[in-house]
């Protein structure tokens, strides 16, 4: 089965069609966007944290470099109510960092910082 099928017990017909025809593609797990102008802020590969240390990120890193965006690998853990409780984050581009364990509030601060940095030149910045 496909990864999509693993989560939803249904197939992903487009992904399956691509594989059957040797057409290669990936899905980028996350593309953070500006809340005002919708420009991209970052790319991320995300994965439920089962203690693994690796996920394929080569294409996401290449796209991020081409777009001049930071990119991240994010492993996340959830509690029994499926609320994110911790994340292991590695910055992939422009400079690779060591993996860092962060709480959701810490990751939110990083994402908020990316929005703040973008706001300096945002074409639709909301003034407060």
Residue ranges and their predicted role:
Residues 56-63, 67-68:
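Basic/aromatic recognition patch in beta-strand/loop cores that engages polyanionic ligands
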């Amino acid at each position: 089965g496909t990864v999509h099928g693993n989560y939803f017990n249904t197939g992903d017909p487009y992904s399956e069609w691509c594989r059957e025809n040797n057409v290669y593609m990936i899905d980028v797990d996350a593309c953070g966007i500006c809340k005002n102008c919708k420009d991209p802020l970052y790319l991320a590969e995300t994965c439920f944290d089962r203690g693994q240390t690796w996920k394929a990120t080569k294409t996401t890193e290449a796209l991020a470099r081409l777009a001049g965006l930071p990119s991240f690998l994010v492993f996340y853990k959830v509690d029994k109510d499926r609320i994110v409780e911790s994340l292991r984050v590695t910055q992939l581009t422009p400079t690779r960092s060591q993996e860092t364990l962060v709480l959701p509030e810490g990751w939110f601060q990083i994402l908020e910082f990316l929005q703040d940095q973008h706001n300096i030149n945002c074409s639709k910045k909301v003034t407060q």
